Amino acid sequence: MSLGLVGRKVGMTRVFAEDGQSIPVTVLDMSANRVTQIKTADTDGYNAVQVAYGSKKANRVLKAEAGHFAKAGVEAGRGLKEFTADAAKLAELKVGDTLTVELFQVGQLVDVTGTSQGKGFSGVIKRHNFSSNRASHGNSVTTRAPGSIGQAQDPGRVFPGKRMAGQYGNVKRTVQSLEVVRIDAERQLLLIKGSVPGSKGNDVVVLPAVKAGA
């Protein structure tokens, strides 16, 4: 993992390229990423930067958290996130600094991680893209049933990992190699080509793409 930012999904819109092409983009608000701690291999066993993101009411902050934020001299955040970084990058940062969208460049590929939208309890057709059974000719109650889920007496159980009905969505997902279309440094906005996981207002983590050179 390399240095990145934590932000919130604002929503989707579109922008027009110079040739008139309409490009669908997701707007991400990446403001208020404040460095709260710098970890080094000598003191912590690894190199990393801890950042606080978002904001939180003072009466909602635990005493331990309040002390940590006060020691760093930053406003209390909604949460903390660590990004690993090399020693050279750590030397450029200090506690209390603010990370901005200038970490990225237009045209750069990034990986975006978020929590996908929850769809509730869903059947196997919606959840796992199973095919439905026949809707007539003697089939009355098993049109959307999963079918056999295992053998009989031997082994007499359902194998772990069997695809069945259950909670659909609301899981951590990463979309890789999305292009940064525009950067609004004044409002700390990133416009990413395509869609990213989650609903409006959800937290997302943006990192340089792992497979950018592939």
Curated annotation (Swiss-Prot):
The modification N5-methylglutamine is found at Q153. Keywords: Methylation, Ribonucleoprotein, Ribosomal protein, RNA-binding, rRNA-binding. Residues 132-155 are annotated as: Disordered. One of its GO terms (molecular function) is structural constituent of ribosome. It comes from the Bacteria. Gene3D superfamilies: 3.30.160.810, Translation factors (2.40.30.10). GO terms for cellular component: cytosolic large ribosomal subunit. Residues 132-145 have a biased composition (Polar residues). Methylated by PrmB. One of the primary rRNA binding proteins, it binds directly near the 3'-end of the 23S rRNA, where it nucleates assembly of the 50S subunit. Belongs to the universal ribosomal protein uL3 family. This is Large ribosomal subunit protein uL3.
